[in-house]
Curated annotation (Swiss-Prot):
GO terms for molecular function: pyruvate synthase activity. It catalyses: 2 oxidized [2Fe-2S]-[ferredoxin] + pyruvate + CoA = 2 reduced [2Fe-2S]-[ferredoxin] + acetyl-CoA + CO2 + H(+). It is an enzyme of class 1 (oxidoreductase). One of its GO terms (biological process) is response to oxidative stress. Pfam families: PFOR_II (PF17147), POR_N (PF01855). It comes from Pyrococcus abyssi (strain GE5 / Orsay). The keyword Cell inner membrane does not apply. The lineage of its organism: Archaea, Methanobacteriati, Methanobacteriota, Thermococci, Thermococcales. Its EC number is 1.2.7.1. The gene is porA. Heterotetramer of one alpha, one beta, one delta and one gamma chain. Keywords: Oxidoreductase. This is Pyruvate synthase subunit PorA.
Amino acid sequence: MPIRTVMKANEAAAWAAKLAKPKVIAAFPITPSTLVPEKISEFVANGELDAEFIKVESEHSAISALVGASAAGVRTFTATASQGLALMHEVLFIAAGMRLPIVMAIGNRALSAPINIWNDWQDTISQRDTGWIQFYAENNQEALDLILLAYKVAEDERVLLPAMVGFDAFILTHTVEPVEIPDQEVVDEFLGEYEPKHAYLDPKRPITQGTLAFPAHYMEARYLVWEAMENARKVIDEAFAEFEKKFGRKYQKIEEYRTDDAEIIFVTMGSLAGTLKDWVDKKREEGYKVGAAKMTVYRPFPVEEIRELAKKTKVLAFIEKDISMGLYGAVFTDASAALINESEKPLMLDFIAGLGGRDVTFNQLDEALSIAKEALEKGKVEKPIHWIGLRKELL
């Protein structure tokens, strides 16, 4: 029987790793994700998880160790955040290029400088071009479930790419919520044994991994990573469907909320989706035709789902906890690219909010709604990007 309990998202991530039965875990502690490897080390020390736990001196070493372990043919896991993920950047490309389905939990935290240990998405968003699949959790249950789904998708032979699962620093990592821990037997049926055919070290089958590629071969190698990410679109849908059958919880790349007659739809990710849905309920009671959409999968970017969502509304607005310096928020930019060749598309707005752990309040969302309403009334967007919740007295 599944176990109903309460726990932090960090603990939920550790339980997900335990259920997935990785053989090698390598990690270096960093706020706010330290509890994940701490809990896993307890599982290993207590004999509850048969795995090698490698204590390393940096996040760069942690991901490097997992590249070697995954190339040797075993399931692997790690967790990090913020500057730790940034330190891994060099090796993230290597893991994807070598087609190693490593899974990593991320307590989404702001990047320095200034130093900040609280939540936004800049750490994972900054890794969007590395070839890693990216999932974002709204709550602690999703943190557990999406790690299991990450293994399911990453290890599929049509994909064979690493994956990361982000959940918001402190808002989720250190907050206790109800979580259902699934049966080990059901998880075993869902994931199966990891038996790689493409990459493993075997004296009877000598191969070279991570070798030099000359111009005559390099481009094809990069194409295959791109193709695998495209393949992941279908594999993710299949994994979501199978997960629902086995565990009873439904996931979608984009989950819609009260969008059927919405003139304005706000899109976001992570725990902010819960706030947004509550705010939509309040605005509906006040007579506003607004809806919400939560993006669970950011890479591969849900192009078709965004196109379908765009057909339902007159204004599509994004609330995001990241910024691509010199342009807009990354999610808005990607969505704009997805819609560029559509003959009809809604007005589009981007709202930057909640950076460095600043609360995103109903008042801030009201500010965004006011701007969206003005664009709707005028039939045009005069300024696509807006920062909401700024303390202008500090500027």
